[in-house]
Design a protein with these regions (language model features):
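Positively charged n-region of N-terminal signal peptides that target proteins for export
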Residues: 1-4
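Bacterial N-terminal signal peptides
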Residues: 6-17
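Mature N-terminal, pre-catalytic/accessory segment of carbohydrate-active enzymes
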Residues: 19-194
């Protein structure tokens, strides 16, 4: 019988910081996301003065210009088998622009091991990627015969971007997709990030 591993991701492990210094990720071409047709109807009056972050279900997408209606969650628990890939989603939002947002996760460490490399997951086991928005049409009735002019254009969260940092524009949302590839030889137990 396989034993499971559990992971705790505190939001404090995710860093909203000014971009600086070298990074070890390759350079990727950038593109300008299209304007959000829903931006004109967005109400950010309830947003606070500071950037916000919350872990959310991986089953939900967020409109780029819509203030998220979420219960703040500062931690996420994932349960996985050895050799399994599991994911989490963090959503960032701000009423003001924030330059150079980076998302980093500290090394996972087994709850019972504090000093040695034993009981740790390698840094390569965890990836963070910004979710980018692409233009689409509303899903409405699903996949059926339809006339394009009968369906509204929408900006939808779809693409995972490998870039190490990204600016968060004022009154926008930026999801972050977190992937954990559990090594085949990982010891069973509870792993945490500081």
């Amino acid at each position: 019988m396989k034993r499971t591993l559990s992971f705790l991701l505190p939001a404090a492990a995710m860093l909203l910081a000014a971009c600086g210094g070298a990074n070890d990720r390759p350079s990727f071409p950038d593109f300008q996301e299209m304007a959000d047709p829903a931006a004109a109807f967005a109400d950010w009056s309830a947003a606070g003065d500071t950037p916000c972050a919350s872990f959310v279900t991986t089953d939900r997408r967020f409109g780029k210009s819509q203030l998220p209606d979420v219960e703040p969650r500062t931690a996420c628990r994932l349960t996985a088998w050895r050799g399994e890939r599991v994911s989490a989603q963090l959503v960032l939002w701000s009423a003001d622009s924030v330059g150079g947002v980076e998302c980093r996760i500290a090394k996972f460490r087994s709850a019972g091991v504090l000093t040695s490399d034993e009981g740790r997951l390698p840094e390569s086991a965890v990836r963070t990627r910004f979710v980018r928005y692409v233009m689409s049409d509303e899903f409405a009735c699903g996949c059926c015969k339809r006339k394009p002019q009968d369906f509204a254009a929408v900006l939808t969260a779809d693409m995972l971007d490998e870039r190490p940092s990204m600016a968060l524009e004022a009154c926008t949302v930026r999801p972050v997709w977190i992937t954990v590839d559990v090594p085949q030889d990982a010891a069973p137990g509870l792993y945490r990030t500081p």
